[in-house]
């Protein structure tokens, strides 16, 4: 299936400023080809979901953008500069929380700032701000084992936001929480995208989640892994969080994406 722009949804005629650009990315693990000649642009200040079935290279692409993996060929640029490794312009929100078990919430959130040499009073002030922004005010002195899975993931998100990276990379961050918590996270994420003016790159297996939270959806298909379609659900972005899932365009996009993926689900 060829790559197509504006596959579904209201046509978007805006010209974009791209924060992240991937060009001709190929990556193999031994004889297993994870990505082949993949190119993809990520508009600045927007949330792009990378969606596709298991084994299509979503997490591999995210780690290459983060600088945690090197491609066999091709290049990623962030703000016009080639990615050669991890950098302060990118922050990663992990699927498994990746918190320090012996550290309090505020220490976990401030940890990245501590590594950068930010003074204690300044980093704690920044940490307090983002702890409040993600809905954890009052839990600053709690420890990870005292928190629910959803609360621990909020700590991870606050930590990523606190370092003021321009690009936030999120690897299925809501997969380990229950459905009610997941929906609340999705609503909060929409607010954060509007407030923070950062570029979010969001890996998910959930079609419904991708359509709900995204300004742009990159649909990846396997064998070989490639970008099949770029979808911009612009018609539902201003419907309000309570109305998006009831909108006919939302339902149509979800259904059409499933039609594209059905044959690749094992």
PLM-predicted stretches and their roles:
Residues 216:
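Short, glycine/charged-rich "phosphate-handling" switch motifs in NTP-dependent
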Residues 134, 220-221:
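Conserved acidic donor-binding loop of glycosyltransferase catalytic domains
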Residues 72, 165, 221, 261-265:
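A general structural signal marking secondary-structure boundaries and capping sites
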Residues 78, 219-220:
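Short hydrophobic beta-strand elements within the C-terminal catalytic ATPase subdomain
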Residues 222-252:
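Conserved beta-strand-loop-alpha-helix hinge in the C-terminal portion
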Residues 2-9, 243-266:
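Non-catalytic connector elements of ABC transporters
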Residues 6-208, 213:
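ABC family nucleotide-binding domain
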């Amino acid at each position: 299936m060829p790559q197509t722009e504006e596959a579904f949804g209201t046509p978007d005629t805006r010209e974009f400023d791209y924060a992240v650009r991937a060009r001709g990315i190929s990556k193999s693990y031994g004889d297993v080809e994870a990505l082949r000649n993949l190119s993809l642009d990520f508009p600045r200040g927007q949330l792009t979901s990378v969606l596709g079935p298991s084994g299509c290279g979503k997490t591999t692409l995210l780690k290459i953008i983060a600088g945690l993996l090197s491609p066999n060929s091709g290049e990623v640029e962030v703000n016009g500069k080639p990615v050669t490794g991890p950098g302060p312009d990118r922050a990663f929100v992990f699927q498994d929380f990746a918190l320090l078990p012996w550290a309090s919430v505020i220490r976990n959130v401030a940890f990245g700032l501590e590594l950068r040499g930010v003074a204690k009073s300044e980093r704690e002030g920044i940490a307090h701000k983002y702890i409040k922004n993600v809905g954890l005010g009052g839990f600053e002195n709690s420890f990870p084992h005292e928190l629910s899975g959803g609360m621990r993931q909020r700590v991870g998100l606050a930590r990523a936001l606190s370092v003021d990276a321009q690009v936030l990379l999120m690897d299925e961050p809501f997969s380990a929480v229950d459905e009610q918590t997941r929906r609340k996270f999705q609503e909060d994420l929409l607010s954060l995208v509007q407030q923070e003016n950062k570029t979010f790159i969001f890996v998910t297996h959930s079609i419904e989640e991708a359509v709900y939270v995204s300004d742009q959806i990159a649909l990846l298909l396997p064998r070989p892994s490639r970008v099949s379609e770029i979808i911009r659900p612009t018609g539902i972005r201003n419907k309000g969080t309570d109305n998006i899932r009831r909108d006919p365009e939302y339902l149509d996009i979800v259904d059409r994406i499933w039609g594209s993926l059905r044959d690749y689900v094992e």
